[in-house]
Amino acid sequence: DNVTIEHSAIVHGCTIGDNTLIGMGAIVLNGARIGKNCIIGAGALVTQGTDIPDGSLAFGSPAKVIRALTADEIEENHRNAMHYVEIARESLI
């Protein structure tokens, strides 16, 4: 729930936890597991079988965990997802 996958991202055969954002142009490959409350940076490459723990910021190629997200960043992920839900609702009217 509340996952945001930004423009040109590729997600294939992976698991993405709730309230996570996959940045523009990121690639997440088979068997990768992205925990809940994460941000995968724009252009990141999450390789096959990689495990990104809950609450992590990860970027790079290959993607590596840089640090834990702050409470404000986790809340912003949720607000971002809800914004897209609202846009979708408006477009259906």
What residue ranges belong to the model's regions?
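A structural motif detector for beta-strand N-caps
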Residues: 1-9, 14, 19-26, 32, ...
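C-terminal segments of enzyme domains that contribute to small-molecule binding surfaces
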Residues: 4-5, 9-10, 57-93
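Residue-level preference for alpha-helix termini and adjacent loops
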Residues: 28, 51, 64-68
